[in-house]
From Swiss-Prot:
Keywords: ATP-binding, Cell membrane, Chloride, Chloride channel, Endoplasmic reticulum, Endosome, Glycoprotein, Ion channel, Ion transport, Isomerase, Isopeptide bond, Lipoprotein, Membrane, Nucleotide-binding, Nucleus, Palmitate, Phosphoprotein, Repeat, Transmembrane, Transmembrane helix, Transport, Ubl conjugation. InterPro entries: AAA+_ATPase, ABC1_TM_dom, ABC1_TM_sf, ABC_transporter-like_ATP-bd, ABC_transporter-like_CS, ABC_transporter_C-like, CFTR/ABCC7, CFTR1_ATP-bd_dom1. This is Cystic fibrosis transmembrane conductance regulator. Residues 1-77, 147-195, 244-298, 359-858, 940-990, 1035-1095, 1152-1481 are cytoplasmic. It comes from Ovis aries (Sheep).
């Protein structure tokens, strides 16, 4: 960034904004980069502004019982705000004085008024000077108010962020991300946009008073006729606005539904393609779009009428003011033209300025109150522990996440009992819900310095809550805690901050090279880092999305280990690691590197418990066991089945299996208002979430997608509740910290299962606390793997043993503190946060306009029709001009002596009738023609939007994954949300306004030129100057706007990133650093925004300066040209004076149109994406010579066996190479192997080795080379749809879209209910579905939030069974499954897919034991492909990964092979006898 010229600019340069010329010149000549932007002044920096407001707010808090944020803002900004308001008022006063001089100039043309004639030239000079003064006053005032609004926004942005970092976890559990984003975007943007209008709340009444006084002098009491009409018009516009909001509110729900489905489709586009659901998803979305567009059209028609009312009101204001006076008393022309000019100013004040000002104050005060409430919420308090460096002690500790919740629970229970609920097992409900129970009860333990405490337990037992209490995030209600204050923490779900790998590991602690390298080695990160071109200095953005889940987990662990602390809290740090890597890291890092440190490890692995010094097992918040491992074996032999739910599926009753559904549904009913009767609550509780969650329309932010979707929250018209709404819904709050996707999920659900869904979903919100505890398991599968897939290879060879040394003994002198860098490179910040720069020209090309016009054939005809109507209007005006002088001359000859003696031209009663008829006739004609012109235009433009959405949706669904992998999910969603909203809402009305204003200006110029041809000579250069100036400015402004838009994203990204890692931030004490980073992001945005405001004001001022020159020319041509009549001069000067505002408005509208057309350019860019196979709408039509001749896929019908393909499921893979993007590095190279029909093959490899990639390659979802044959049919001989239908898929990322059970299982409606129920029986889903009202017609929302992860996996399994596929692909199907669902899947695979080929990628050893062959992938290639017997007998990855106990389980498999002798079996048995108890909890 460069030094700003503003620092050394002179007063004149600042007044005329000339200091912006260098950036305007550079932007016109070349593309602007971030380095071209100017540094902001110190007065605009977030640090100074936040410190100033924070100081005043603290003063307000300290001095008053009811602190008001507006008082703090007043003390910071009031005097400057008032100063610019007074200047603005003086500029507006000049508009009221101008018509007075105009009237004097017109009066000077009266032959009897020679005195006035002599000073006409001076009157003209005075009129021109008024325009110059107005220009010099208004623009600095408007810019100053915009500047103050920007500063207020920055200060409050920072204040909200600082408060967010201080909020207690209890408060965070009650606030959704959508509410925070709403505070930072929808609310605070009002200050930027509206502060310039705020002063009109007092300026407009003063202006109206002054104008009414001047009009009284002209028309006396008849003045109030026009004012009354304007007041009625303002009320009418308010009514139209209310009607428009009604339609928009109705439409918002439809937009929600469409965006929900679209978001789910985009997030799961791989699954959509794998299931061949493209046509089904397109049909669902288009049906929703149709309903949405009906309401869009209604809202657009109302908006059009509202906008048109302003344009056409000018006729009637003058008509109602002048006509009564003229009929009774007669009127001179001077009064007519003066009245017209006064009425134009009056109309603007009454119908635009004052209503806008009132709305601005209403919105701003509402936003300030919301922020004020937020700033007074409870803060996180660091607990005062009894500090010690020798041990950690808990004595009889009990804790609640929600204080006072037991009373609320009992009240709800009593209310429900009083209602005598029928057909509901209330005892089961309340026994499972456990709302009023503490999360931890009577916890006591003690560990000495240097010991390892392993904490185990079932899902929701309170393991994470225990760590939170030690960290101070959860305040104990009873008991004592004693430990050292120096804590290091590793979260269960890895959190990566924007920055380099080194920054993430060091995390502000002083850099020690030896310690750093030791930690890198212990956490198995050496080889990963070596694969990156920039090594550990590679910048990671968006939560480390370029890394695999295992890499993120190891970086998070390395961060915790690097810090020198007294107590290390490790919350399930090995969740995403393969068995071998986990084993090595546990040994080298936890057991050796940290041997002298006190460690608390949350785990579910028996081998970890065996090596722990002490074991603490929790169950339902209580201590189930505390002691050593040997004591555990002796005292609690049943602990495995008790805690982990390992009983077999058949031993559970149907009631217990279905308890998760029963509890979830009834919890929804309980969450309603307790004052509502049960019947009123129950009925909506089973329909769409939005129906029973009217209070909870605020957004739900998915932990993965929230960062990418803020443009949706900011730009769409969706409604959000404020922060204050959260306090009204105590029953909605979550109690447990453990998300539903935790490995080893228990039988009974948590009462707060985390909902995942996009930003704009209605219904149950996800709190910030849920966001912090959400899994990011799918982040590594994002589209950004294109940049990291080649680096995710990991060595299969174990690392060398780490020397048993104490790396923490090498403490540097400054190591006790945190080293916080104040210097943050803006370029690095851009790498961390910014989206890819769009490859769109700075100015919309003519080709885009032409293509837009030709999208729908009717648009061209409508534009021609508009031109015809305009010509008719101009012709009508010229006819009036021709008739007008004749009427006046005729009347002049017939006038009485008294009349002729007073003024030369007087309109008598007779001529008034003629003028009345002409005036009203022209007004009616223009009004009718305007309606005929505008309504078809708006209607057609919405039709064009409909067509573009349809084409874009088709293009995305048909695009190859290699193209979609290069796009960010949020970017795709923005096209369907923000850009389509622009095409639907903003563009039609903006185009209408531009065309209307352009035609008004052209018509006025034509009339003036006809009346005085000399003026046409001045008009030509003025028009040329406008066109050149617009083109010059547009290049720079659009680039600055784009940079500003890109600069906004890091602010919200940083907010969510901070929230997701808030516990880590507090544990490491990194809040100051993150505040600094947030301020840097704010400053970066401010630099772009301030420069955009400055250049915009430069442009606006130049427009007015050109017009002032034009008006001076018109004025003096009219005055100096002899022979002009009074009426002609009046028309010329009135039109010329009032062209100014219209012309400026028209030029601004043209810039707005160009800016909005960038959305059209982006949509066209998506429409032009290539299609899969380069052929849109592929359909398979085999030629006569194609072989085999009877190739087909089973779809709806049962066919003869001779016609079925595939029939056996044999696969042959030859030289398969796969890439994620065109031109990218190969992820898999030269893969060749074959699979026999009905065989089960397991895929083995380290984390990130390419197992999931291989499954995607089978489905042709990647850029692939080579050949695969299924039962002799090559994938090149049939279409993609046919090829993919040969596979059944259970993806790692489960896809449940918003719709009924039936739609989710059978979106094409191919199967009967009997078939679906039969399959539901097979996979164990019948009892689940039957619990819901409507059964198969029950509508699932929020990604199936009422279903457990296991049930969602069963849904995928049911889809595969329905597809009758012969080849089944399973990608980590047991990840995050509870044992019950896992047993169901294993049973279904054995029964329903007994004769199918199964390819399985799995970390769970038990599942792999059922495979006949294994494919080992290492370094992008097949390293080994063999049977289970050979894999166990050789040194292989499989043998390293499998435990001796699991090898013992494989004895039956090996014994079945006749090639193995009993001696080998005996040797294996002897080898594993000692470790036979080593199993997974």
């Amino acid at each position: 960034m460069q030094r700003s010229p503003l620092e050394k600019a002179s007063v004149v340069s600042k007044l005329f904004f000339s200091w912006t010329r260098p950036i305007l010149k550079k932007g016109y000549r070349q593309r602007l980069e971030l380095s071209d932007i100017y540094h902001i002044s110190s007065s605009d920096s977030a640090d100074n502004l936040s410190e100033k407001l924070e100081r005043e707010w603290d003063r307000e808090l300290a001095s008053k019982k009811n602190p008001k944020l507006i008082n703090a803002l007043r003390r910071c900004f009031f005097w400057r705000f008032m100063f610019y308001g007074i200047i603005l008022y003086l500029g507006e006063v000049t508009k009221a004085v101008q018509p007075l001089l105009l009237g004097r100039i017109i009066a000077s043309y009266d032959p009897d008024n020679k005195v006035e004639r002599s000073i006409a030239i001076y009157l003209g000079i005075g009129l021109c000077l008024l325009f110059i003064v107005r220009t010099l006053l208004l623009h600095p005032a408007i810019f100053g108010l915009h500047h103050i609004g920007m500063q207020m926004r920055i200060a409050m942005f920072s204040l909200i962020y600082k408060k967010t970092l201080k909020l207690s976890s209890r408060v965070l559990d009650k606030i959704s991300i959508g509410q925070l984003v709403s505070l930072l975007s929808n609310n605070l943007n009002k200050f930027d946009e509206g502060l310039a209008l705020a002063h009109f709340v007092w300026i407009a009444p003063l202006q109206v008073t002054l104008l009414m006084g001047l009009l009284w002098d002209l028309l006396q009491a008849f003045t109030f006729c026009g004012l009354a009409f304007l007041v009625v018009l303002a009320l009418l516009q308010a009514g139209l606005g209310k009607m428009m909001m009604k339609y928009r509110d109705q439409r918002a729900g439809k937009i929600n539904e469409r965006l929900v489905i679209t978001s789910e489709m985009i997030e799961n586009i791989q699954s959509v393609k794998a299931y061949c659901w493209e046509e089904a998803m397109e049909k669902i979305i288009e049906n929703l779009r149709q309903t949405e567009l009906k309401l869009t059209r209604k809202a657009a028609y109302v908006r059009y009428l509202n906008s048109s009312a302003f344009f056409f009101s000018g006729f009637f204001v003058v008509f109602l003011s002048v006509l009564p006076y003229a009929l009774l008393k007669g009127i001179i022309l001077r009064k007519i033209f003066t009245t017209i000019s006064f009425c134009i100013v009056l109309r603007m004040a009454v119908t635009r300025q004052f209503p806008w000002a009132v709305q601005t104050w209403y919105d701003s005060l509402g936003a300030i109150n919301k922020i004020q409430d937020f700033l007074q919420k409870q803060e996180y308090k660091t607990l005062e522990y009894n500090l010690t460096t020798t041990d950690v002690v808990m004595e009889n500790v009990t804790a609640f996440w929600e204080e006072g919740f037991s009373k609320l629970f009992e009240k709800a229970k009593e209310n429900n009992n009083n209602r005598k609920i029928s057909n509901c097992d209330t005892s089961l409900f309340f026994s499972n819900l456990l709302l009023g129970t503490p999360v931890l009860k009577d916890i006591s333990f003690k560990i000495e310095r240097g010991q390892l405490l392993a904490v185990a337990g079932s899902t929701g037992a309170g393991k994470t809550s225990l760590l939170m209490m030690i960290m101070g995030e959860l305040e104990p209600s009873e008991g004592k805690i004693k430990h050292s204050g120096r804590i290091s923490f590793c979260s269960q779900y890895s959190w990566i901050m924007p920055g380099t790998i080194k920054d993430n590991i060091i995390f502000g602690v002083s850099y020690d090279e030896y310690r750093y390298r030791s930690v890198i080695k212990a956490c198995q990160l050496e080889e990963d880092i070596s694969k990156f071109s920039e090594k550990d200095n590679i910048v990671l953005g968006e939560g480390g999305i370029t890394l695999s889940g295992g890499q993120r987990a190891r970086i998070s662990l390395a961060r915790a280990v690097y810090k020198d602390a007294d107590l290390y809290l490790l919350d399930s740090p090995f969740g995403y690691l393969d068995v071998l890597t986990e084993k090595e890291i546990f040994e080298s890092c936890v057991c050796k590197l940290m041997a002298n440190k006190t460690r608390i490890l949350v785990t579910s692995k028996m081998e970890h418990l065996k090596k722990a010094d002490k074991i603490l097992i929790l169950h339902e918040g209580s201590v189930y066991f505390y002691g050593t491992f040997s004591e555990l074996q002796n005292q609690r032999p049943d602990f495995s089945s008790k805690l982990m739910g390992c009983d077999t599926f058949d031993q559970f009753t149907a009631e217990r299996r279905n308890s998760i559904i029963t509890e979830t549904l009834r919890r929804f009913s309980l969450e309603g208002d307790t004052s509502v009767s049960w019947n009123e609550t129950k009925k909506p509780s089973f329909k769409q979430t939005g129906e029973f969650g009217e209070k909870r329309k605020n957004s739900i932010l998915n932990s993965i997608n929230s960062i990418r979707k803020f443009s949706v929250v900011q730009k769409t018209s969706l409604q959000m509740n404020g922060i204050d709404g959260a306090s009204d819904e105590p029953l909605e709050r979550r109690l447990s910290l453990v998300p539903h996707s935790e490995p080893g999920e228990g039988i009974l659900p948590r009462s707060n299962a985390v909902n995942s869904g996009p930003t704009f979903l209605g219904g149950r919100r996800q709190s910030v606390l849920n966001l912090m505890t959400c899994s990011s398991v799918n982040q590594g599968q994002s589209i950004h793997r294109k940049t990291a897939t080649s680096t995710r290879k990991m060595s299969l060879a174990p690392q060398a043993s780490l020397a048993e040394i104490d790396i923490y003994s090498r403490r540097l002198s400054q190591d006790t503190g945190l080293e916080i860098s104040e210097e943050i490179n803006e370029e690095d910040l851009r790498d961390c946060f910014f989206d890819d720069v769009e490859n769109i020209p700075a100015v919309t090309t003519w080709n885009t306009y032409l293509r837009y016009i030709t999208v729908h054939k009717s648009l061209m005809f409508v534009l021609i029709w508009c031109l015809v109507v305009f010509l008719v209007e101009v012709a009508a005006s010229l006819v009036v001009l021709c008739l007008f002088p004749k009427i006046l001359l005729q009347d002049k000859g017939n006038s009485t002596k008294n009349a002729s003696n007073s003024y030369a031209v007087i309109i008598t009663s007779t001529s008034s009738y003629y003028i009345f008829y002409i005036y009203v006739g022209v007004a009616d004609t223009l009004l009718a023609l305007g309606l005929f012109r505008g309504l078809p235009l708006v209607h057609t433009l919405i039709t064009v939007s409909k067509t573009l959405h349809h084409k874009m949706l088709q293009s995305v669904l048909q695009a190859p994954m290699s193209t979609l992998n290069t796009l960010k999910t949020g970017g795709i969603l923005n096209r369907f949300s923000k850009d389509i909203a622009v095409l639907d809402d903003l563009l039609p009305l903006t185009i209408f306004d531009f065309i209307q204003l352009l035609l008004i200006v052209i018509g006025a110029v034509v009339v003036v030129s006809v009346l005085q041809p000399y003026i046409f000579l001045a008009t030509v250069p003025v028009i040329a100057a406008f066109i050149l100036l617009r083109g010059y400015f547009l290049h720079t402004s659009q680039q600055l706007k784009q940079l500003e838009s890109e600069g906004r994203s890091p602010i919200f990204t940083h907010l969510v990133t901070s929230l997701k890692g808030l516990w880590t931030l507090r544990a490491f004490g990194r809040q100051p650093y993150f505040e600094t980073l947030f301020h840097k992001a704010l400053n970066l945005h401010t630099a772009n925004w301030f420069l955009y405001l400055s250049t915009l004001r430069w442009f606006q001022m130049r427009i007015e300066m050109i017009f002032v020159i034009f008006f001076i020319a018109v004025t003096f041509i009219s005055i100096l040209t002899t022979g002009e009549g009074e009426g002609r001069v009046g028309i010329i000067l009135t039109l010329a004076m009032n062209i100014m505002g219209t012309l400026q408005w028209a030029v601004n509208s043209s810039i707005d149109v160009d800016s909005l057309m960038r959305s059209v350019s982006r949509v066209f860019k998506f429409i032009d994406m290539p299609t899969e196979d380069g052929k849109p709408n592929n359909s398979f039509r085999p030629s006569k010579d194609s072989q085999p001749s009877k190739v087909m896929i089973i779809e709806n019908q049962h066919v003869k066996k001779d016609d079925i393909w595939p029939s056996g499921g044999q696969m042959t893979v030859k030289d398969l190479t796969a890439k994620y993007i065109d031109g990218g590095n190969a992820i898999l190279e030269n893969i060749s192997f074959s699979i026999s029909p009905g065989q089960r093959v397991g895929l083995l490899g380290r984390t990130g080795s390419g197992k999931s990639t291989l499954l995607l390659a089978f489905l042709r979802l990647l850029n692939t080379k080579g050949e695969i044959q299924i039962d002799g049919v090559s994938w090149d001989s049939i279409t993609l749809q046919q090829w993919r239908k040969a596979f059944g898929v259970i993806p790692q990322k489960v896809f449940i879209f918003s719709g009924t059970f039936r739609k989710n299982l059978d979106p094409y409606e191919q199967w009967s209910d009997q078939e679906i129920w039969k399959v539901a029986d097979e996979v164990g889903l019948r009892s689940v579905i039957e619990q819901f009202p409507g059964k198969l017609d029950f509508v699932l929302v929020d990604g199936g939030c009422v279903l457990s992860h296991g049930h969602k996996q069963l849904m995928c399994l049911a889809r595969s069974v329905l597809s009758k596929a012969k080849i089944l692909l399973l990608d980590e199907p047991s990840a995050h499954l509870d044992p019950i669902t896992y047993q169901i899947i294993r049973r279904t695979l054995k029964q329903a897919f007994a004769d199918c080929t199964v390819i399985l990628s799995e970390h769970r050893i038990e599942a792999m034991l059922e495979c006949q062959r294994f494919l080992v992938i290492e370094e992008n290639k097949v390293r080994q492909y063999d049977s289970i017997q050979r894999m166990l007998s050789e040194k292989s990855l499989f043998r390293q990964a499998i435990s001796p106990a699991d090898r013992l389980k494989l004895l039956p498999h090996r014994n079945s092979s006749r090639q193995r002798s009993r001696a080998n079996i005996a040797a294996l048995k002897e080898e594993t006898e000692e470790e036979v108890q080593e199993t997974k909890l």
